Amino acid sequence: MTDLKKAAQRAIELMDLTTLNDDDTDQKVIDLCHKAVTPAGNTAAICIYPRFIPIARKTLDELGAEDIQIATVTNFPHGNDDIAIAVLETRAAVAYGADEVDVVFPYRALMEGNETVGYELVKACKEACGEVLLKVIIESGVLADPVLIRRASELSIEAGADFIKTSTGKVPVNATLEAAEIMLTVISEKNTKVGFKPAGGVRDAAQAAEFLGVAERILGADWVSPRTFRFGASSLLNSLLHTLELADAPKRTQGY
């Protein structure tokens, strides 16, 4: 197997296959669950809006794919600074049966100089999650400044995040190698049990390999696993399956 095919295989096993569109329906989520069961193995998770968790759970059970985790989003996509609402949304997501919650850090508050609200919001949402995995989306493409990307990562980890994630996929700049370098370096300094999720903008096996390479250089080859590394993506899967000669070439899309 070529290096590119190896990267494609790994990226599928590390993928949060995502649909977070305003026009999502039960049927689209059912279709997503079927796509997550690929000829190259199951994706690590699917990521959907909270209201679709019950139908996703039913579908995955019917497919015998109980190993696929169900992730959802809260405080999404704008990263508001109302802690009470973020906590209520997170509690509701857990009650729906989410295995993982991706919460948006109040990044605009941080840009305005308020570090406290981000820390407190993540801390409260982690308490609401209990054993459910909490991924914190820092929206690195909007923060832009390396100092802010680093600080959002530090605050999230200090507050109890299980993962730090680059992006919502709802802004012009999503996952970049530069942001990955900063975020993975913070993980190496503060807590190597914390995971990293580049989301949006990873289009093919070659790009996936670049992100995996940064993680391995900073944290070691043994660090990367579904417990510590995920790709958030929708259009990436077809490209990876094409690389593995298991699907036709994907049509060019503007997808996440």
Swiss-Prot record:
EC number: 4.1.2.4
Gene3D superfamilies in the cross-refs: Aldolase class I
Example GO BP: deoxyribonucleotide catabolic process
Enzymatic class: lyase
Annotated active site: D102, K165, K197
Pfam families xrefs: DeoC
Reactions performed catalytically: 2-deoxy-D-ribose 5-phosphate = D-glyceraldehyde 3-phosphate + acetaldehyde
Any single Gene Ontology cellular-component annotation: cytoplasm
Pathway(s) of this molecule: Carbohydrate degradation; 2-deoxy-D-ribose 1-phosphate degradation; D-glyceraldehyde 3-phosphate and acetaldehyde from 2-deoxy-alpha-D-ribose 1-phosphate: step 2/2
Entries under CDD domains matching the protein: DeoC (cd00959)
Molecular function GO labels: deoxyribose-phosphate aldolase activity
Highest taxon above the source species: Bacteria
Claim: Plastid is one of the keywords in the record: no
Keyword annotations of the record: Cytoplasm, Lyase, Schiff base
Compartments where located: Cytoplasm
Primary site of residence: cytoplasm
UniProt family annotation: Belongs to the DeoC/FbaB aldolase family. DeoC type 2 subfamily.
Biological role stated in the UniProt entry: Catalyzes a reversible aldol reaction between acetaldehyde and D-glyceraldehyde 3-phosphate to generate 2-deoxy-D-ribose 5-phosphate.
Protein name as catalogued: Deoxyribose-phosphate aldolase
Organism per entry: Shewanella oneidensis (strain ATCC 700550 / JCM 31522 / CIP 106686 / LMG 19005 / NCIMB 14063 / MR-1)
Lineage of source species: Bacteria, Pseudomonadati, Pseudomonadota, Gammaproteobacteria, Alteromonadales
